[in-house]
Structure formats: C-alpha cells, structure tokens
Amino acid sequence: MSPSVFKISPGINSYDWGKKGSASLAAQLATTSIPDFSIDEDKAYAELWMGTHPNNPSRLSDNTLLSEHLKSHPELIGSSVSSKFEDCKDGSLPFLFKVLSIGTALSIQAHPDKPLAKKLFDEKPDVYKDPNHKPEMAIALTPFLAFLNFLPLSVLLLHLLTVPELQEFVDSSLTESLASSLGLPTSQPPDTSLFKPTESPATAEQKDILKQIFAALMSADKKLVEEAISKLIKRYQAKRDIKENEKSLVDLALRLNDQYPGDVGVLCVFLLNVVELKRGEAAFLGANEPHAYIEGDIIECMATSDNVVRAGLTPKLRDVDTLVSMLTYEAAPGNKQLLQPTPFQKGDDTTKLYDPPIAEFSVLRTELSKGMKTSHRPVEGPSLCVITEGEGVVRNGNDRSEFVRGDVIFVGAGKEVEWEAIKGLEMFRAYVEA
C-alpha cells in the first residue's frame, strides 16, 4: 500500500532562452526538490518539469520513476481517470506541469490538435515526438510578456497601411481586400480613429486573407527580411517617422532584434497581440493558436506532449508550411485569451481554480498567511503540487508531512488534504478529474 501524499523530484531543463543562474525561479525551486542539484551561475535554467513525460520524468525519493510507482499503485490515479485516459494504465499522467523562467523570447509557435499531431508523428517522428495535442495554460508568477494570437483585424490593417517595412512583404491587393472586408478605407494618411479594435469574430473570407498575409511574411526571402528589419531598426533607433500605432512596439522590436537579429519574428510585433500578465493572471492557448513567450516566470500546465511547430524567433527547425496551414486565424484583442479564476470551494477565498475548457487538467492556486489552514475536497484523480512561496504542513488523515519552498508533492486520487502555512504560503496544484 502506497502513501497517498508524498514528495517527488522533478526534472530541470537548460535551454538558451532560460534565465541565468540564480535569476531563474525554476533553478531556485530545483535546489530544494532535486537531490544534489546546485546552481551554476553561468548556465541558463529554463524549465522545471513535473510529471511522467519520458523526456524528463519525475522520480520518488528512492529514484523510482513516478510512472512506475503509479502503474504499480493504480488507486493513486483513480479508476475514473484511468478509464478516461488510456495512457494512465501505464502510470502516465495526462498533464505535464512546469515552472518556466524566460530570459529571452521563445519561438513563435503553435501546437497541433489531436488529428494533426497524429499525422505529424506518423510522417516526421524524429521532429514530432508523440501523437498527442498540447493545449496549455500559463499563470504569471512575475510580470509576464507574450505574443498571444492575431491582432484584431482593424489594428493589423492599420499596421499594413503605416509600416513600410511590413508593406514590402504583403501585396497591396491583400491589404485592399482586408480593408474592403472590414469596410475601412486605405487612403493615406489613415484616419486612426476609424481603426478601433473590435471583438467581432473574423469571417471565413477574412481568415483566408489573414492566412495569405501571414504566409507571405513567414515565407519571405530571408535576405529581404533581414534588409527590411535593418531599415526598421535604424528608423526606430533614430526615433524617425514613428507613427502613433507603432510607439508601444518600438522597445519590443528592438529587444527581439537584439536576441534574434534579422529574424522574421521581429516583424510579428505588427501581426500578433502583445499581452502582459500580472502575477496570478492566466492565459489559455488552445490548439493551432500562434504564440510566443517573451519574458517572465510562469506556471505552465499542458496536455502531456512535447509537440511544437515553429516559424520564427528560433535557431531550431522551422516548419513554416505546417504552421501556416494549421492555424485557426482567429483575430481578437489579446484579453480574449485570458482565463479568469473562480473560487475552488464555496466560502473559501484562499484557493482559486483555473479551469480551461479541456479535459486533461485544471490548476489551483492556494495562498495562506502564516498560521492559516485550508482543506481541499477529495479530487477524483491525481494531483501535483509545487510550493512557490513559504513553508507549511500537509495532512491526510493521520499522515503529516512538512514542506518548504521548492518542494513538489504528489496527492493521490480521492484524498482530502489539509494545508497549513508556517510561513506565508503560495502553492499551485495541477490535477485531473474524469
């Protein structure tokens, strides 16, 4: 019989985009939860992984794989979850839980839906490593900046009319077609008061025009892109001819060009929403939606997959054709991507629920002042908890375990647990229920 609540050791990934040394929150937490881990101040630490994904699986204190332990003790996953998710019978969790520390921008990317994931896995298993989809949710731990989906079409059109370096890659007939579909003029100079963002969903015709615009930019000749970006950067550095609609994007374009000189992703500041999340705010990214994390520390939860289709801001393989063909081409204000938390339990404001519209996971955020307690109702599936601030005690029946910042705790299915803060506590708990 296995205990229902126990600590596990996560894995840590070092990628170039991670924050360096002790500046990385992922690395700070790893010093507690990964045996013999010490921070190298010259190394970038990007991700703390919690879960059963084979690329960096979590382990128990005796070094047993968490997946092996769960396979031997299926009651920890619970029968309803095992019935719903076939892989759970092998001890796999249907979600992957992470802490990300982002120092430089990640690639402009999207994740495939299930049918496309299977097709890509069948055709290119060396690139796309599994046949699963990867919807994901990000919760800000520090101020977090990201590209999230396409701009409202009226705003995107204004950029097409005013940014000469963008105009080089988009045929004027596409700009005219987009303007016509929106009932907006293309006269110069544009009357900016007409180009207000709206939440009206894009029509099929507008989505097709947007697809052609995005394809034209992302597949443009590399040398021509570099020359256009060089002109843009010189213009911005000289603070010359900057239109009102460009002003908020200047610093970001300069920063992205510093990180990825001459990369087509720099021009995506004119196509994608730039969204800043404050601590505790969350965004949900469904399949086939373009995004790129730019800076900050986040909690991230996703379906168990490592599939990424990239097309910009990256030295890695770019699969432009796949990305262009797969996107939904929804276009709306960035706040449409935000996910509002709700109380997890009536009358308890210590724990908020982030509940995206998918089956594989939900996430709780619990905050307790020193000496406070809260109980979480039994969850009919497995949970992973990471302590991001403070220290305390968790109780399950007669079992009691102390924890500190950085600890990662597994909670088995169907168990009520009580949390008590010894020091002001912040904890995130990812779980699945069927």
UniProtKB/Swiss-Prot annotation:
Q: Which GO terms describe its molecular function?
A: mannose-6-phosphate isomerase activity; zinc ion binding
A Gene Ontology biological process term? GDP-mannose biosynthetic process
- Just give the chief location class: cytoplasm
Which keywords does UniProt give here? Cytoplasm, Isomerase, Metal-binding, Zinc
Q: Isomerase: is it a keyword of this entry?
A: yes
Q: Where is this region: Disordered?
A: 181-200
Annotated Zn(2+) binding sites: 109, 111, 136, 291
Q: What pathway does the UniProt record associate with this protein?
A: Nucleotide-sugar biosynthesis; GDP-alpha-D-mannose biosynthesis; alpha-D-mannose 1-phosphate from D-fructose 6-phosphate: step 1/2
The record lists the catalysed reaction(s) as: D-mannose 6-phosphate = D-fructose 6-phosphate
For the keyword Cytoplasm, the answer is yes
Q: State any GO CC term.
A: cytosol
Q: What does the UniProt cofactor note say? A: Binds 1 zinc ion per subunit.
Catalytic activity, EC: 5.3.1.8
Q: Which domain of life is it from?
A: Eukaryota
Task: List the catalytic residues.
Answer: 310
Pfam families recorded for this chain?
A: PMI_typeI_C, PMI_typeI_cat, PMI_typeI_hel
Q: Which cofactor does it need?
A: Zn(2+)
Q: InterPro entries, per this entry?
A: Man6P_Isoase-1 (IPR001250), Mannose-6-P_Isomerase (IPR016305), Pmannose_isomerase-type1_CS (IPR018050), PMI_typeI_C (IPR046456), PMI_typeI_cat (IPR046457), PMI_typeI_hel (IPR046458), RmlC-like_jellyroll (IPR014710), RmlC_Cupin_sf (IPR011051)
Q: Residue ranges under compositional bias (Polar residues)?
A: 181-191
Q: Which cell locations does it reside in?
A: Cytoplasm
Read off the SUPFAM superfamilies from this record.
Answer: RmlC-like cupins
Query: What does the record give as the function of this protein?
Result: Involved in the synthesis of the GDP-mannose and dolichol-phosphate-mannose required for a number of critical mannosyl transfer reactions.
Family membership, please give it: Belongs to the mannose-6-phosphate isomerase type 1 family.
Protein name (record): Mannose-6-phosphate isomerase
Organism name = Cryptococcus neoformans var. neoformans serotype D (strain JEC21 / ATCC MYA-565)
